[in-house]
C-alpha cells in the first residue's frame, strides 16, 4: 500500500462536502452507510499501487475508440450518477462518457444525474427514487424488446 498515492488519488474527494464527519463522507449523505463502510474490515483500506495501475489500465481500455466501436450498437445504456460525486467529476465525466457512447453509434443512451447525491447513489438517502428510476428504465426497455404478440 502506498499512502502518498492514496492521498493523491482520493485525498480531495471530501473537498466539496460541507463539514465532513469522516474521510469517507464523499461516498453518501447517509451517515449510517458511511459508518458501516468504515466499520467493515474489507472497506477503507489503502490500495496497492498495482490495484490503481490495473484500474487505470481498464479505464484507458474502455475509453479507446476501438473498444467503444466494438460494442453492440442496439443495446440500451443507462448512465446514472450523483451530481455531487467527485469520482465522476460532479456529473461531467458521466455526461462525457454518454457522449462518447453516442459518438460511437450507440442508439439508445440515457443519462440521469441525481443532484446532491454523492458516489454511492444506491446507498443515498433518496435510494428509493434511484431504484424506482432504474426499475422504470428497465421496464420501458423490456417492453421495447418484448416479442410482438
Where are these regions (language model features)?
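Alpha/beta-hydrolase-fold enzymes
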Residues: 1-42
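Active-site nucleophile elbow and catalytic-triad environment of alpha/beta-hydrolase enzymes
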Residues: 43, 48-69
Amino acid at each position: 500500500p502506498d499512502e502518498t498515492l492514496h492521498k493523491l488519488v482520493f485525498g480531495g474527494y471530501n473537498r466539496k462536502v460541507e463539514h465532513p464527519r469522516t474521510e469517507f463522507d464523499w461516498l453518501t449523505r447517509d451517515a449510517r452507510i458511511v459508518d458501516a463502510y468504515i466499520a467493515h474490515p474489507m472497506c477503507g483500506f489503502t490500495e496497492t499501487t498495482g490495484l490503481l495501475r490495473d484500474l487505470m489500465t481498464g479505464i484507458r481500455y474502455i475509453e479507446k475508440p476501438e473498444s467503444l466501436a466494438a460494442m453492440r450498437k442496439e443495446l440500451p445504456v443507462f448512465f446514472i450518477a450523483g451530481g455531487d460525486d467527485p469520482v465522476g467529476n460532479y456529473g461531467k465525466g458521466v455526461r462525457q462518457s454518454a457522449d462518447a457512447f453516442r459518438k460511437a453509434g450507440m442508439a439508445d443512451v440515457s443519462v440521469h444525474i441525481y443532484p446532491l447525491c454523492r458516489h454511492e447513489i444506491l446507498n443515498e438517502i433518496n435510494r428509493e427514487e434511484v431504484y424506482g428510476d432504474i426499475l422504470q428504465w428497465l421496464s420501458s426497455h423490456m417492453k421495447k424488446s418484448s416479442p410482438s404478440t
